[in-house]
C-alpha cells in the first residue's frame, strides 16, 4: 500500500501541474533558505515554487498529461508552477541566476511542449504580453493615422479641383 503522505503529495503536485500554464524545473542545490525565499518573492504571486521528490514529479506530471524530459529529474529538483505570464517568471529566474551561481534552470514545459534550459532562458528575453500589446497598438495607431491621411488626400484633391472649376466658370 502506498504511503498516505506520498499519495497526498502526488495529488497536490498533479493539481499544480494541471492548473499551471507553464512549469520550470530547477536545481536548488547550494541555495540557502533565505535565497530560496528571495527567489519565491521575485517570482511573484502567480508562481508557486516547490521542492519535490523526482519520483513524485515524474508520476504527477504523467498523471496530469504533462510532458517532462525525464533526464531533467536528477539531483535536487524544485518546480516553478506558473499561472499566467511565463515571460515575467522566466525574467525573474534569469536575473536570480545571474546573482546566484548555484541556481540552475534545468528545463520546463509550456503549452504542452517540453522546453530545454536554453528555451526557458530565451523566453526571458521576450517582451511580456502587455508590452507586446502596447507595441502593437502603437504600430496600428501610426498605420491608421497614415491611412486616414491617404483617404483624406483624394477628397481634398477633388475639393480643390471643384473649387478651381468653379473659379474658371465664374
Curated annotation (Swiss-Prot):
Tell me which UniProt keywords the record has, alphabetically. Answer: Ribonucleoprotein, Ribosomal protein, RNA-binding, rRNA-binding
Q: Gene Ontology cellular component?
A: ribonucleoprotein complex; ribosome
Keyword Glycoprotein assigned? no
In the record, biological process GO terms are: translation
Q: Which Gene3D superfamilies match?
A: 3.30.70.1730
GO MF, one term, reads: large ribosomal subunit rRNA binding
Family label: Belongs to the universal ribosomal protein uL10 family.
What does the annotation say about its assembly with partners?
Part of the ribosomal stalk of the 50S ribosomal subunit. The N-terminus interacts with L11 and the large rRNA to form the base of the stalk. The C-terminus forms an elongated spine to which L12 dimers bind in a sequential fashion forming a multimeric L10(L12)X complex.
Function of the molecule: Forms part of the ribosomal stalk, playing a central role in the interaction of the ribosome with GTP-bound translation factors.
Q: What is this protein called?
A: Large ribosomal subunit protein uL10
User: What species does this protein belong to?
Assistant: Corynebacterium urealyticum (strain ATCC 43042 / DSM 7109)
The UniProt gene name for this protein comes to rplJ
